[in-house]
């Protein structure tokens, strides 16, 4: 099973193909990830590798977390993720994994991250509800959601009903994005299209589960 890496969204720009076509890309900085733990089926019940990215002062983490990193003899990180693996022999605690070890240009990836927080939003903005008539007898009900239930039966609002509330700041995954370029010297990935989050936010990049690179 392929693993992914942790990175930080830098922003968006564009690159040009040899034919002169402009391609919008998201730039992700992926500093070398460090293996903080290798979980085995014998000890943990399943096989997985735990990665950490970024850096964090040891004084800013709790003693149990600091001890976890010290056991692997690595610096404390500000991001952590776990990937299931088939073989535990390929990874050792303290191992450093770079972008060139996992990704190649032309393959497709899935990118996960936290979307931009929008605060409290109504149903028109949050769920794309249509607005009611601007005039013709309609007053003070232009952006209201309308009825949220039925009658005495069932006598309640169903779970999952689309209503106003906190919008954004939720985990989101964009699938099957093309990896345009891998810059191993500067630890950068250029990914075609938009990815979740604001510039500077943490993202998780992993090989696509639904789509393979051309020719495979």
Curated annotation (Swiss-Prot):
**GO MF term (any one):** rRNA binding
Q: Which residues carry this modification: N5-methylglutamine?
A: 152
Instruction: Recite the UniProt keywords alphabetically.
Output: Methylation, Ribonucleoprotein, Ribosomal protein, RNA-binding, rRNA-binding
Q: Which residues cross the membrane?
A: none
On modification after translation, the UniProt record reads: Methylated by PrmB.
Q: Give the highest taxon in the source lineage.
A: Bacteria
Enumerate the Gene Ontology biological process terms.
translation
Q: Which Gene3D superfamilies match?
A: 3.30.160.810, Translation factors (2.40.30.10)
Concerning PROSITE patterns, the annotation shows: RIBOSOMAL_L3
Q: Which Gene Ontology CC terms are recorded?
A: cytosolic large ribosomal subunit
Which SUPFAM superfamilies does the annotation name? Translation proteins (SSF50447)
Region described as Disordered: 132-155
Say yes or no: keyword DNA damage present: no
Q: Does the keyword Ribonucleoprotein apply?
A: yes
Assembly information from the UniProt record: Part of the 50S ribosomal subunit. Forms a cluster with proteins L14 and L19.
The UniProt family comment states: Belongs to the universal ribosomal protein uL3 family.
Q: What does this protein do?
A: One of the primary rRNA binding proteins, it binds directly near the 3'-end of the 23S rRNA, where it nucleates assembly of the 50S subunit.
| Protein name as catalogued | Large ribosomal subunit protein uL3
Q: What is the lineage of its organism?
A: Bacteria, Pseudomonadati, Pseudomonadota, Gammaproteobacteria, Legionellales
Task: Give the gene that encodes this protein.
Answer: rplC
